[in-house]
Each structure stands twice: as C-alpha cells, then as structure tokens.
Amino acid sequence: MKKRVFSTLTTLALSLSLAFGQESPSEEDFYKIVTPPVPEGVLLEVGGMVTLPDGRLAVATRRGDVWMLDNPSGPKPYFRKFASGLHEILGLAYQNGALICAQRGELTKLIDKDHDGKADTYETIYAWPLSAHYHEYSFGPKIAPDGSFFVSGNVAFGDEEWWAGESRRPLRGWIFKISPEGQMEPWATGVRSPCGLGMIDGELFYDDNQGDWIGSGGIWHAKKGAFMGHPAGLKWANALPGSPIKITQEQVYATVDPRKTRDKNGNAIKPENVQNEKFLTLADMKKKYPETQLPAVWLPHGILGVSNAEIIADQTNGNFGPFNGQLFVGDQGQSKVMRVFLEKVKGEYQGAAFDFRSGFQSGVLRMAWANDGGSLYIGETNRGWGSAGDANQGLQRLVWTGKTPFEMKAVRAMPDGFEVEFTLPVDKKSAQNLASYAIRSFTYKYHPVYGSPTVNEAKCAVKGVKVSEDGLKARIIVDNLRETYLHEIKLDGLRSAGLYWSLVHPTAYYTLNQIPDGEKLKLTEVSTKSTAVPTKTTETKTTAKAATGKVPTFEEVKPLLAKNTCLACHAVDKRQVGPAYTEVAKRKYSNEKIVELIYNPKPQNWPDYATPMAPMPQVPRDEALKIAAWINSLAPKSAPKP
C-alpha cells in the first residue's frame, strides 16, 4: 500500500513538474509558414494579390507582370503569365470576371475576352497625373459595397528638402473613389504613404507609415472629408472639383510650425526632434479642427512594424484560429503580420493591436485568403525598401495547425479600465495577482520631423482585477486612463490553466480614443492581492558587470535592445531595415556619438537605406551608453604589428 501511494505521489509530482516547468509554445507551434516552389526565372516582387472564385490566385508584380496560379495551395502550383508591360502594380482586385489593378498613373481593367488564359484587353478606367518622382506609388483598388474602387496616392519628396512630403500633382496624398464608369470622387486627404487599404464591414480603413507629420504607423478609419494629418495633400483641397475637405494647409502651418528654415548660406535645414519642447499632438489638432481623424489604432513604430501594409479581415469562421472578425496587418519592413481587435465606442473606432507571426522570408506587402478556408497567402518584396528576412521577394502561405494558442483574444475598454478576453482559460492564481499586470500610456508629437519619440509617458496603476468563473476574461481597474493615448498592457505574469503556459504575445497596445460610459467595478468585488515577482539573479549580475565599465556581451545587452525596439530594424551582422551593428561599428563613432545619433539620427549618413531612423530620446542614457559600448566592441580588431 505504501509503495502504491509513493508511486502515485511520484507520478503526480512529475506531472506537475512537466506542466509547470515545460517551455511555453511559440508562434510557429500554431501557425506554419509554407513556401511553394516558384519556376526558375519568375520574379515575384508581389505588389498585388487576389484569390479568384475558382480558387486560382492572381499575383501582380512590381515589375508589371500578372501571374495566374493554378492549384496555389498545392505542392506544385502551376504559373501562367496573364498580363505584362504594366507600371509598378501595387494592388489587385477581381470584379465580374476581370482583374482591376492600380498602376502608377491609372486604374486598369484586365480582361481575357477569348478565354485563352491571357489578358487581351487593357482598359483604362481612370488616369491621374504624375510628376515622375520615385515615391509617387499608387495603391489599390479596394472594392466598395456599391462596386466602385478606392485608390490611394503616395506623396513625393522635395528635391532640396528631401525629407519633406510634397503633393506635386493632384491626388498625391489623397484617397479617392472611382466609379466603374471612370468618374473620380475625392474622398479624404492627409495621407503620406497609404500602402494598406481595407474594406471592413463595408467601411474603408487604411494604414500609414511613420514619417514627417506621422508620429508612428497606425490604422485610420477613412471617412469621407477626413484629414488624416499630413498637410501636403491640402494643397488641392480647394482646387479639386468635388473636394469634401474644409481644412487648409495654411491653417495647419499656422497651428504647427512647418520649420522651413534656412542656414546663413540659404540651404534648407532638415527639422530635427527638439527635446523638452512644447508640442502639439494629433488629438490637439482635432480639438481645433474636428475633421482631423485620429488613428483607430496606433501601431507603435519598431514594435508593431515599421512599414505597415495590407489590411485584411478574418472571415474564415474559425478555420484560421480563434480570431474570426479581427484584422491582420502586414508589415513590409519587419516581414511579419500583426493582429488588431477593433470596437466602436461613442461612434469612433478604437482597439488593441498585438504581434501575431514573424519570420517571413521577405517584406510582407500583400495578403489574400486561400479558398481552402484556413490559410493565408503572403506576397513579399523589399527592393529599394529593405526588410527582415533572407530573400528579396517571394510568395508564402501561413497555415493554422489546428491548435489554439494561449493569447489575449481581445481587449475592450471599460469605464474604469479594460477587460481582457483570452483564447484559453487562465490560471486564476496568476490572473488574480495584480503583479501580473503592468500598464503605461504614451502618445506622439504632431510635427514636421520624421517620426516621433513616445512622449508624455505615464504609469497606470492596476488597482484590482475580477476574473470570470470560466477563466476566459479578466476585468482590470486601471488608474490614470487618458483619452486619445496609447495604453501598453503587459501581462507577463499570467499563465494558462492546466499547462501553465505563458501568453504567446503578452503585450497589447490599446488606443483609447474614447472612455466608454457604464458601471464601474467596486473594490469589494475584485482581487487586490499583489505578490511581486522576484528579480532574477542574472539581471543583478548584468547590472553589476556594466557598472564596472566592462563591455557587455550580446546576451547582456539583448534585453536592452529588445526593450528599446532596436532589434526591430537592426541585426548583429546582417542588413535589415537598418544597417547591421557590425557596419555601424566600422564607422568608429565614439560611444557618446552613438548616443547622440540614437537621440537625433542622421539619415544622410546611410543613403542606401530607404527608411530613416526616428529620433529615440526616450532611451535612458545609461542604457544607450551600454548599447553603444557593445556596438563598438564589434569593430574589427586591428592586426597585430609584426
């Protein structure tokens, strides 16, 4: 009897050890990346992609070709060239048996009239003017419920003021609507690089990239008559027939100095971030000019992408995992896909953004659902732009394994905090511990500088938590909620029930445009227990080593690189969005100079990189110095003298 009891206890202890001690699963355990073979000589710099009703996949390339793929989800898709000779296609749609694409200067219908598998009619639906500047990309179309097409136009940049977005021709910096008969309707302006358009439940959304006047990437609800923030397109607000825009460029410049200054020799001076200055935010602009549209969701630059791209809704009814109805957003620079949960509060969209799946071979520009109901085609390119990954272009497919990841399924705003919904039940002990939660809020400057540091940062104390009986929801009381601010919600201490997994992605970024009305929780109905997580010994050792003046190792500096989003754009010895750290080390900057360049980057120092680094004065000086010392330790050692 004693042996049997001992054996049972031993088995139980082993089971608990395995459950509590095993490594938590990661992204690739739930979503697999499949790379189909591509025929030799076929260059897929994917600019547009759409799945046809019969299951074929149409793929448009930036080099002007359109390929039709039979059996695209199979082991050997068959490629057939459908069209060629087009001008940098950056979007593709299907309507009534024809393909519709956005070239640089026109919306084009491609028709295969004789059904031989090749387009024999290239019909111009609508054309718009160009200045021939390289940055005048045109994106779209997305098909509206009435059958018309939405297209968006990039700004150009100045010849001397190469950092400043310009609208040299009408519709640059605009979103516009085109009827099937070719009638154009100006829709909205204030966009800078609107690469991703998405029709969500019949409403138009778009995403933009960090740059001048755009503090960080984000997703905007593109209402008719809205001004999104970049003033270049306002040049045509009163000149375009049918323009719904009321705000003027002069009004913007009277409110925020465009800083078009010159030195004593008459040369234009590039605006740089000014620390400790008085500044306005986009929310301040909205108070003065109500037509200003705030992002429904900010996508923090360097954390949730650097070059936001395709927006696509999950309409698979659960065949792609537990996120039906949510949005997936591609990122060209970081070669990954993010996930977004949207809700409507007091008439405005807002919501939470999460990481989802990284590790694609090149920049994720376009996405399309496969007809198999449970996988997502990923179209990739990085020529001229740079990206993470080992390839310059390609086509891949993201496939759900059928296993449910432990994730925050949704985050909803509450009158006194947030409600977090999970995909699997939480371990209630960890979920009822306030130390499992950490929340801070911040926003961005609205200014003519390229990007913005995070500003007005503040901690938001978690005062209580109420976990639902089924363990699928945790409602948290949060102090210091701020409307229009981004709220970073970190749940590092939470674990799943049973297997005790960590969240695959423990951080959500909720854009709180409106605090909802409603009943608040009472402190008597929530847990207020807080058991702090002890500091790891290794962290103490790292700090001690750094304090002695020794150069930190990569393992010691890696947490700082991750915390400050450095790894989003840089690798140790490989070019990504930015230069490799080994290349920076070859410049032989002093540690102090590197810190200065972190706070105020000089893009002209790296002319071969398309995406300038944003100012990062929020990096603590002691951490910046440690990072600088480590970078300089990578410099090639001089050969010993004979």
Predicted regions and their residues:
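Beta-propeller domains with acidic blade repeats across secreted/periplasmic ectodomains
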Residues: Q22-P405
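The canonical Cys-X-X-Cys-His
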Residues: M367, L395, N564-D573, I627-I631
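Surface beta-strand/loop "capping" patches
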Residues: T401-K428, A435
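Acidic, Ser/Thr/Gly/Pro-rich low-complexity segments and short DxT(G/T)-type signature motifs
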Residues: G402-A410, D427, L491-A546
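Short, surface-exposed alpha-helix to beta-strand junction/turn motifs within ectodomains of secreted
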Residues: T423-G464, K490-S496, P506-Y509
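C-terminal capping alpha-helices of c-type cytochrome domains
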Residues: N480, P615-P642
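Electrostatic cytochrome c docking/interface patches
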Residues: T538-A562, P642
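Axial heme c-ligation environment in periplasmic c-type cytochrome domains
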Residues: A568, K574-K586, N600-A628
